[in-house]
Structures are given as C-alpha cells and as structure tokens.
C-alpha cells in the first residue's frame, strides 16, 4: 500500500466510521500506519483470495473494517464493554462483522462457538505483549479453528529495538531492575502494560514449543510505522540506524502457517 493509496484507503475508512457515528479517532490516527503495513506485508505474498478473518483484540474494529472492505468476512473478538458501544455495533452491522464478546482470553469460550477449520486468517496484532495468563487454552482454540491452509498474523514490539526495553543502562546502574517500572505497574490499568516483550528468536521458539504443526513462514523486523514523526537530527539518525541494522527495528511481524494438524498444541502447563 503506497503512500497515495494508503491516504485514499484511510479516507475511505474514515468515512465509514463517520457514517457509523464515530470511533476512537486518536487511536485510529495513531495506529492506521501499522494496520496498513501489516495488511500490505500479508498481501505481498498471499496466494489465495479473501476468506474468513478472526480479529482477536479487535478494539473498535479498525482492522476488521479495513479487511472487510477488501472482501474478508470478519469475526471480531473483544471485551463485552467494547461491543456495547453504539458506533461499534453500527459499523459491525454495516460490514457484516460478527461480534464475539470474551471477558477473559485465558478462557476463550467465544472461540469455542466457531467450527473447526473455519478460519483463513487470524489477526493477533499488538496483543501477545499484553497477555497476563498462561495462553495454552487460547492457542488450542486458535489451532482448532484455523484451516491447515490458514495464516496466523502476529505483530508485537521488538524487545531488542534500538528504542526498546532491553537497553536500560541507567536502571541497571542504579539497581532499579528491568522490565515494567513500578510506576507503570501501579499507575496503569492491567491491559495497558507490555507484560512481556519478545525478540524474534523468542517468538520463533514460542510457536515451535506450542506445536510441531505451526510453521513460521515470516519472521520480520519491521521499520518504524510513522517515520515522518522523526524530524529532528537525532530522530533522523535513529531512523538511519534502524534502517541499516534490522535487528534494532521497533516492530516484529510474524506469519505462522500450519504444516498439518496431526500434533495439536502439545505444551502443557504444570506446577
């Protein structure tokens, strides 16, 4: 999706949400570049037509609508409180998006209502870093409903990004630990935290340990989605470094297929 095309698609998407009564506009404006980049990368190597899409953590349906506009039959999963919003229900009705409410993804009861082998693509974008529970039950359901020819699309921050969490020399030097800061832990609601950020190698291992059926087809370090924000000399230098050294780029884009469905999700939580 080149710049001119991306602008046209955004304008069309914006019109759709205006007609539906609005949306979370700041979130859409901040994240559309990511939505577009994710779909562009998926489309770049896609060999089949549009099919059934499952958008997990769909929020205000921005990605669900974007894909529905391209012919996908979207099913969206999110918290009940989100799907009670009138404009969310309106835009869902306009695009025949099925809404599945699920309060706790550790117990993915909403996914149990979907037939096996019924989904062609699963969007799991900017979700995995927020998970606070053992996800085995969730992945078992995703494995069950994803067709053998389907694709799981995962995007998440890169732990080793140049501007990322791995590089905290001041915290290390002052004995203030790593990971979440205490200010973030205590001062923000549960679902806003990045409880666990991953490196590319970690995510490759993650899906290998889940099931021998999962096949990592793409494992990419993605550049900054909105480079136009970095206009200072320092900002431009950061962009140049990230361009030259892919491992320091801020984002990961994974596409995971299924070799077959002989093994299932073999990981088993235990004390």
Model feature map: region roles:
Residues 2-33, 79, 90-95, 101-110, ...:
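S-adenosyl-L-methionine-dependent methyltransferase catalytic module, highlighting the catalytic core
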Residues 30-50:
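Conserved alpha-helix/loop element of class I SAM-dependent methyltransferases that forms part
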Residues 49-59:
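Conserved class I S-adenosyl-L-methionine
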Residues 60-72:
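Conserved SAM-binding loop of SAM-dependent methyltransferases across substrates and taxa
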Residues 73-78:
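Conserved SAM-binding motif I beta-strand of class I
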Residues 81-83:
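Helix N-cap at the beta1-alpha1 junction of Rossmann-like dinucleotide-binding domains, i.e.
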Residues 109-122:
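A short acidic, Gly/Pro-enriched loop at the edge of an enzyme's catalytic core
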Residues 121-133:
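A short SAM/SAH-binding and catalytic strip from SAM-dependent methyltransferases
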């Amino acid at each position: 999706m080149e710049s001119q095309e991306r602008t046209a698609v955004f304008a069309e998407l914006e019109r759709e949400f205006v007609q539906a009564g609005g949306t979370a506009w700041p979130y859409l404006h901040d994240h559309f570049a990511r939505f577009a980049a994710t779909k562009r990368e998926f489309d770049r190597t896609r060999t089949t037509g549009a099919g059934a899409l499952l958008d997990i953590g769909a929020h205000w349906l921005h990605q669900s609508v974007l894909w529905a506009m391209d012919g996908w039959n979207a099913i969206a999963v999110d918290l009940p409180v989100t799907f009670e919003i009138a404009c969310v229900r309106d835009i869902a009705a306009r695009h025949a998006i099925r809404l599945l409410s699920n309060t706790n993804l550790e117990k993915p009861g909403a996914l149990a209502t979907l037939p096996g082998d019924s989904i062609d693509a699963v969007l799991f974008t900017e979700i995995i870093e927020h998970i606070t529970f053992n996800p085995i039950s969730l992945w078992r359901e995703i494995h069950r409903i994803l067709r053998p020819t389907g694709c799981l699309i995962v995007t998440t921050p890169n732990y080793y990004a140049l501007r990322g969490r791995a590089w905290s020399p001041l915290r290390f030097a002052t004995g203030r630990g790593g990971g979440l800061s205490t200010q973030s832990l205590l001062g923000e609601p549960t679902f806003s935290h990045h409880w666990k950020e991953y490196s590319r190698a970690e995510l490759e291992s993650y899906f290998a340990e889940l099931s021998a059926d999962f096949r990592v087809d793409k494992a990419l370090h993605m550049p900054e989605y909105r480079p136009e924000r970095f206009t200072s000399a320092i900002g431009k230098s950061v962009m140049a470094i990230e361009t030259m050294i892919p491992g320091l780029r801020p984002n990961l884009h994974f596409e995971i297929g299924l070799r077959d469905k002989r093994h299932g999700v073999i990981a088993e939580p235990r004390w």
